[in-house]
Swiss-Prot record:
Cofactor entry: [4Fe-4S] cluster
EC number: 4.2.1.33
UniProt-annotated stretches for the region Disordered: 416-443
Name of the protein described by the UniProt record: 3-isopropylmalate dehydratase large subunit
Keyword vocabulary terms for this entry: 4Fe-4S, Amino-acid biosynthesis, Branched-chain amino acid biosynthesis, Iron, Iron-sulfur, Leucine biosynthesis, Lyase, Metal-binding
Pathway(s) where this gene product acts: Amino-acid biosynthesis; L-leucine biosynthesis; L-leucine from 3-methyl-2-oxobutanoate: step 2/4
GO biological process terms, semicolon-separated: L-leucine biosynthetic process
Source organism: Frankia casuarinae (strain DSM 45818 / CECT 9043 / HFP020203 / CcI3)
Binding site for [4Fe-4S] cluster: C347, C407, C410
Species lineage: Bacteria, Bacillati, Actinomycetota, Actinomycetes, Frankiales
A GO molecular-function descriptor: 3-isopropylmalate dehydratase activity
Highest taxon, organism lineage: Bacteria
Gene giving rise to this polypeptide: leuC
Length: 465
């Protein structure tokens, strides 16, 4: 019987297999940031162990860093302590670190791909759930906990139980104006936040193949919001063109050899998935979340749902709680919902193509009065590229704030937060209660929808401007 892409990568990395025990996997790349690593390094220190493969480990400061005055000391003492601990630990254990103000600094899931570290057929881990981003390259990439971070630092291996596999085929072509973010929100709305639990999702079909690498990263990034262990897309010429010439990618004969191997990384025609889902791309429109989990999403042209629309008692209770928290009334057009803040950035949508999409909407327009707009590049390299193209001038002319790189308003762990009761249109990946600050209300959208919303002050598709 044939094997799926996930099974091929998994099998190639099994160091030890025994009945009744998890497989022991070799890890090709370990990404590290300041929040989930301090205890892991301290455990190594107490045990007198080195980092096993420091050359396969890369660290960056992203979660806690400010995006305005990056030369001043970090004001929050806990955040400052975590950043300082990462610097100390990387220096002591010989791990390459990209600190604040370094040209290479940025969100860990933006930095890895832009350096060419994320490659097809690899196993990639990080103490961060959105490690699934790197699956866009045909890598098996997943988040791990702090104790597992220690295990990988010490051994470059990780015990893991073999996951199930799921195929999500997006048939046909996406309509004009529908982005990768709209697609993944629609997928999560369809299968639910637990729909991928215990599975590695492989995204397939014409619509997936038509996506750029950055669009593919957006889709794989939010696999975890569907409950999946990881998300993957088989590598193809789009992948190879993206990787060619990047700093950490082979050249010459070694490159040709790598590409030849990467071309074998596709699910066999007779591979059997544990679950299969088909999505009709042509039926999709811009999507937005209305509730407090990413599965509570709907087309932007629809109405706020009512609890009575749901047959299950638990679902009705969840919807009622979400509407209460979000301050929404059933039957309200989603396009009538006003916002206080727009955030464009994050490891989901903080890449150059995302900023270009936002700039295309904002060019020649002004931000609605009273709306705060934060545009935060995913890395300092993305920031430099955007400025070279003049995108920062477009944003400033529109009345938006152009920031330095970091996780920013994706999560309430740095100065960029919502105040209680404030409502945002956000290109990030989670809309949980308090995710962007205590009492903050978050609507997940694409960069283009976020930019259009900034112009009108209410949830808006660019086509409606």
């Amino acid at each position: 019987m044939g094997r799926t892409l996930a099974e091929k990568v998994w099998d190639a990395h099994v160091v030890r297999r025994a009945d009744g025990e998890p497989d022991l996997l070799y890890i090709d790349l370990h990404l590290v940031h300041e929040v989930t690593s301090p205890q892991a390094f301290e455990a190594l220190r107490l045990a007198g162990r080195p980092v096993r493969r420091p050359e396969l480990t890369l660290a960056t400061e992203d979660h806690n860093v400010p995006t305005t005055d990056t030369l001043a000391p970090i004001a929050d003492p806990i955040s400052a302590a975590q950043v300082e601990a990462l610097r100390k630990n990387c220096a002591e254990f010989g791990v390459r670190l990209y600190p604040m103000n370094d040209p290479g600094q940025g969100i860990v899931h933006v930095v890895g791909p832009q350096l060419g570290l994320s490659q097809p057929g690899m196993t990639i881990v990080c103490g961060d759930s959105h490690t699934s981003t790197h699956g866009a390259f045909g890598a098996l990439a997943f988040g791990i906990g702090t104790s597992q971070v220690e295990h990988v630092l010490a051994t470059q291996t990780l015990p893991q139980r073999r996951p199930k596999t799921m195929a999500i085929t997006v048939a046909g072509d996406l309509p004009v104006g529908v982005s990768a973010k709209d697609l993944i929100l629609a997928i999560i709305a369809r299968i639910g936040t637990g729909g991928g639990a215990g599975h590695v999702i492989e995204y397939r079909g014409a619509a997936i193949r038509a996506l750029s690498m950055e669009g593919r990263m957006t889709v794989c990034n939010m696999s975890i919001e569907a409950g999946a262990r990881a998300g993957m897309i088989a590598p193809d010429d789009v992948t190879f063109e993206y990787l060619a010439g990047r700093p950490r990618v082979a050249t010459g004969a070694a490159w040709e050899e790598a590409v030849a191997y990467w071309r074998t990384l596709a699910s066999d025609s007779d591979a059997v998935f544990d679950r299969e889902v088909v999505i009709d791309a042509a039926s999709l429109t811009p999507y937005v979340t209305w509730g407090t989990n990413p599965g509570q999403a709907a087309p932007l042209g629809s109405l706020v749902p009512a609890p009575a629309d749901y047959p299950d008692a638990a679902a009705r209770a969840s919807v009622e709680r979400a509407l209460t928290y979000m301050g929404l009334t059933p039957g309200t057009p989603l396009s009538d919902v006003t916002v206080d803040t727009v955030f464009i950035g994050s490891c989901t949508n903080g890449r150059l193509s995302d900023l270009r999409a936002a700039a295309d909407v904002l060019r020649g327009r002004r931000v609605s009065e009273g709306v705060r707009v934060l545009i935060v590049p995913g890395s300092m390299a993305v920031k430099a590229q955007a400025e070279a193209e003049g995108l920062d001038e477009v944003f400033r002319a529109a009345g938006a704030q152009w920031r330095s790189a970091g996780c920013s308003m994706c999560l309430g762990m740095n100065p960029d937060t919502l105040r209680p009761g404030e409502r945002s249109a956000s290109t990030s990946n989670r809309n949980f209660e308090g995710r962007q600050g205590p009492g903050g209300r978050t609507h997940l959208v694409s960069p283009a929808v976020a930019a259009a919303t900034a112009v009108t002050g209410r949830l808006t598709a660019p086509a409606d401007l």
